């Protein structure tokens, strides 16, 4: 059992016979009255978002989530195909199950597949990936005072904002949680 005061992003809970994943949480301590926890929850069965408020002392059972290492094989336009690296079983998922979690993942990269009672509800890419920039405008010295960025398209087709000194053909590290440029590799 987990109390509402211990909620964290990514935590999965069973509430009212449904399984939810905490997307956002905020501890609120008003000047008058009792503290509470404001959350945004995602139903893992249908993907619907719900906002709900809890008292910090309320307790809920944590849902058992299976995490399996999978290799992203390819996309055929409609389905995304993965292979379990231990059993070599292949699984195909549609856009709804995958979402935008693969925008920084290349074919044959490793990901984590999250499922509850056999139903896949999310794909977790690695925290950091290294990708090559395939298209960006050249940056010129003296363009700006400080901290300017420009859009760059990486080999997976996603767009990332990078500093002006990064050029086409450079390999960069990207934080997949935020989509931010981290460093040039």
From Swiss-Prot:
One Pfam family in the UniProt entry: Elong-fact-P_C
One GO term of the biological process aspect: peptide biosynthetic process
Xref: SUPFAM superfamilies: Nucleic acid-binding proteins, Translation proteins SH3-like domain
Record localization: Cytoplasm
Pathway(s) per entry: Protein biosynthesis; polypeptide chain elongation
GO cellular component, one term: cytoplasm
Main location: cytoplasm
Domain of life, source organism: Bacteria
A molecular function GO annotation: translation elongation factor activity
Record-linked PROSITE patterns: EFP
UniProt keyword Hydrolase, yes or no: no
Keywords on record: Cytoplasm, Elongation factor, Protein biosynthesis
Known function: Involved in peptide bond synthesis. Stimulates efficient translation and peptide-bond synthesis on native or reconstituted 70S ribosomes in vitro. Probably functions indirectly by altering the affinity of the ribosome for aminoacyl-tRNA, thus increasing their reactivity as acceptors for peptidyl transferase.
PANTHER family: ELONGATION FACTOR P, ELONGATION FACTOR P (EF-P) FAMILY PROTEIN
Family: Belongs to the elongation factor P family.
Protein name: Elongation factor P
Originating organism: Lachnoclostridium phytofermentans (strain ATCC 700394 / DSM 18823 / ISDg) (Clostridium phytofermentans)
